Curated annotation (Swiss-Prot):
Domains as described in the record: Consists of 3 domains; the N-terminus binds the ribosome, the middle domain has PPIase activity, while the C-terminus has intrinsic chaperone activity on its own.
Membership in a protein family: Belongs to the FKBP-type PPIase family. Tig subfamily.
Keywords of the record: Cell cycle, Cell division, Chaperone, Cytoplasm, Isomerase, Rotamase
Molecular function via GO: peptidyl-prolyl cis-trans isomerase activity; protein folding chaperone; ribosome binding
Regions crossing the membrane: none
Catalysed reactions listed for this entry: [protein]-peptidylproline (omega=180) = [protein]-peptidylproline (omega=0)
Protein name in UniProt: Trigger factor
Species whose genome carries this gene: Treponema denticola (strain ATCC 35405 / DSM 14222 / CIP 103919 / JCM 8153 / KCTC 15104)
Record gene name: tig
Compartments it resides in: Cytoplasm
Length: 451
């Protein structure tokens, strides 16, 4: 197809593409379309395939020209976009739109203009000479003990307490409860049966843990509680409630002993408790290493972004917000459409939530754009040998058979993720060498990972 094109880059990573298709191509395409319709259309008074072109033009001329305009736009854009560089072609989620409906005249060149969003073009300025502070952390015996206790809890047997046992902290209570009015009658809609919680956890609406202590199975009790003005539950803040509670069941957790048998019950690969402890320590140390690496990368990226102008197109921001909404729907195990119905309208509507996420989404996108630009500018690649070495490292680190790991990464998409991650590691390794990394505050394992 013979055409002229011109791309103009505008603000907010927006582009306009003007196209002029030569009249010779317009006329040739018009003739082909007329011939096609003359063979396919059946008009009263004419045999199928024998409709004169002049009749077609008289009866369907405008419609045929409209179809031709659409075909020419589609064909030319496909060809043009394949020839443009990545900073001039549209983003996958930015569909080109016509500035105005073009008029097609068979005897003239056909011109039209479309606009769309493109990948932000960033002029790289400062990427070195920064000072970043990264916290320190280590794994203590206390951290390992805490994890062992968590495993104990997870593997505990829940057993009913003997009749007549008084409720204590850490017992598992099953209660029926309701609110009472001034006359001691049940307030409709406040009843709840078979509510289960661990005494001392505070995981109950009225925070009645201490009031349950001492009660026995089958016993009922009326509790009056006044809640502070700043209570986290706005429905209770500053109010006094009278609650009737009946303890219907009382159980306790029978924790397994921390011994070699316990370790083997967790996983047969552990011969004794010491091996389990060593594995916990190894996994925690990996978590510390990965977290510190992530904090270091984020700290440098954040400083670099401040030194650059990055114009994000609205379609890119919108796509990121919709992606987060979809992830939220997956967490709720529902569809994005159903999630929107669940939240309804008002301060917690989809629109309100997305607007609340906008600032963080834009920050994340700017970081991604800058990193991607640096990877391209520095032409960073990874070799097959580097990927193989990473397979071995991950196999040892994750305690997974090498063949099994390679099978997972035989999926092209997963292998691409791995490759991109290695490229980023190479990029940041080079960037760190040209900046100063200072040791920051010493944190505990829990403090480091709390986010």
């Amino acid at each position: 197809m013979d055409y002229e094109k011109n791309v103009t880059l505008k603000e907010k990573s927006h582009a306009e593409l003007s196209v002029k298709i030569k009249k010779s191509d317009v006329q040739e395409s018009y003739k082909k379309l007329l011939n096609k319709y003359s063979k396919e259309l059946q008009i009263p008074g004419f045999r199928k395939g024998k409709v004169p072109v002049s009749v077609l033009e008289t009866k369907y001329g405008d419609a045929i020209k409209g179809d031709l305009a659409g075909d020419l736009i589609e064909e030319s854009l496909k060809e043009i976009f394949e020839s443009l560089d990545e900073y001039e072609r549209p983003l996958p989620y930015s569909y080109p739109e016509l500035n105005e409906k073009p008029e097609l005249k068979v005897e003239e060149d056909f011109s039209f203009t479309v606009h769309y969003d493109v990948f932000p073009k960033v002029e790289i300025k400062k990427t070195e000479g920064f000072t970043i502070e990264v916290p320190e952390a280590s794994v203590s015996e206390k951290d390992i003990k805490k994890e062992l206790e968590r495993l104990q809890e997870r593997n505990a047997l829940v057993t009913a307490c003997k009749e007549g046992t008084s409720a204590e902290k850490d017992h598992i209570a099953t209660i029926d409860y309701c609110e009472l009015d001034d006359e001691g009658k049940t307030i409709s809609g406040t009843e709840r049966k078979d509510f289960v919680f661990t005494i001392g956890s505070g995981l109950n609406i009225y925070k009645i843990d201490d009031d349950i202590v001492g009660m026995k199975k089958g016993e009922s009790k009326e509790i009056t509680k006044t809640f502070p003005e700043d209570d986290s539950n706005k429905d209770l803040a500053g109010k006094t409630k009278k609650i009737k509670v009946t303890l219907t069941a009382l159980k306790y957790k029978d924790l397994p002993a921390l011994d070699d048998d316990f370790a083997q019950d967790i996983n047969e690969k552990y011969k004794n408790l010491d091996e389990l402890k060593a594995d916990i320590k190894k996994k925690f140390e990996i978590s510390v290493e990965e977290k510190i690496k992530s904090l270091q990368k984020n700290a440098l990226t954040e400083q670099m972004v401040k030194e650059h102008t990055i114009d994000l197109p609205e379609s890119m921001v919108r796509a990121e917000l919709e992606s987060r909404w979809m992830m939220m729907a997956n967490q709720f195990r529902t569809t994005p459409e159903e999630l929107e119905k669940m939240f309804g309208k008002g301060p917690q509507s989809k629109a309100a939530l997305l607007e609340g996420w906008r600032e963080d989404s834009e920050k994340t996108l700017k970081e991604r754009v800058l990193i991607e630009t640096l990877l391209k500018e520095k032409n960073i690649e990874v070799s097959d040998d580097e990927i193989e070495a990473e397979y071995v490292r991950l196999s040892e680190r994750m305690d997974i058979a090498l063949d099994e790991l390679k099978k997972y990464y035989s999926n092209p998409r997963e292998k691409e993720y791995l490759s991109e991650g290695l490229k980023e590691e190479k990029l940041f390794k080079a960037l760190y060498e040209k900046s100063t990394i200072k040791k920051g505050k010493k944190l505990t394992f829990d403090e480091l990972l709390k986010d």
